[in-house]
């Protein structure tokens, strides 16, 4: 009797085949997994994580060129350290210290940005320099357009070719014209136009393997003008006593000390 009822039920309510059950389970799984994959992919795209990081350094007295996979070209001044981070939807360079020239290949969907501490430089297809001095950075535009902003400093500031700004946390100077000869550092020529001695020594330190120390801070504002060979920093230091009331003394540890002339 039971067998008859079982057979009747099977005829009225046929069981799906094993293949059909497998397809049905697969369909339900796909309905669950695909949205999760979409949510995950969207989250990754928004977060824009770095999937590749390269560390580059130039030695004292060395200028180093780097060509990126996207066709952009970087030139590191002496004593410079930076990181190139390739993100999913952006390109980012972190300037840790020193100066670099950026010649950027434009990409609409993968913007290029340089970070120097709290200073952010956004590229719009350009050639520009960023010189980081601790918390202070100088951004100089030679061709194209860049936008500069600082953490806690309000809206982005756009530069025109031949302009520069000084930027630090919470502060961004108005754009000002820059001497075109300042671009010659890429060819090993240092152009100083009434530049404070303290700043000159900071630049020369990139090209000199021994510490250069300004013993008397009062001498820091003294102005230096001229065009010098970056690869001959020792000669530049030897010339300073001829144009300024200073003297250069070599200490027992080999460091060079500038002090007021006796």
Spans of model-derived segments:
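A residue-level detector for the "anchor" residue at the start of short, highly conserved motifs
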Residues: 10-262
């Amino acid at each position: 009797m039971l067998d008859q009822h079982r057979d009747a039920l099977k005829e009225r309510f046929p069981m799906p085949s094993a293949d059909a059950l497998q397809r049905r389970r697969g369909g339900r799984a796909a309905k669950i997994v695909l949205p999760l994959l979409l949510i995950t992919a969207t989250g990754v795209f928004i977060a824009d994580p770095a999937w590749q990081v390269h560390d580059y350094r130039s030695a004292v007295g060395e200028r180093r060129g780097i060509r990126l996979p996207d066709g952009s070209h970087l030139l590191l001044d002496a004593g410079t350290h930076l990181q190139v981070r390739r993100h999913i939807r952006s390109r980012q360079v972190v300037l840790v210290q020193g100066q670099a020239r950026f010649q950027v290949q434009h990409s609409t969907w993968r913007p290029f940005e340089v970070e120097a501490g709290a200073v952010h430089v956004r590229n719009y297809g350009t050639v520009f320099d960023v010189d980081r001095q601790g918390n202070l950075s100088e951004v100089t535009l030679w061709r194209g357009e860049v936008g500069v902003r600082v953490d806690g400093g309000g809206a982005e500031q756009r530069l025109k070719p031949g302009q520069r700004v000084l930027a630090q946390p919470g502060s961004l100077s108005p754009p000002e014209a820059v001497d075109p000869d300042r671009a010659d550092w890429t060819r090993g020529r240092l152009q100083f136009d009434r530049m404070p001695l303290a700043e000159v020594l900071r630049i020369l330190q990139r090209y000199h393997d021994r510490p250069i120390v300004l013993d008397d801070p009062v001498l820091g504002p003294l102005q230096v003008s001229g065009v010098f060979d970056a690869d001959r920093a020792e000669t530049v230091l030897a010339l300073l006593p001829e144009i300024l009331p200073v003297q250069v003394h070599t200490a027992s540890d080999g460091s060079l000390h500038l002090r007021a002339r006796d």
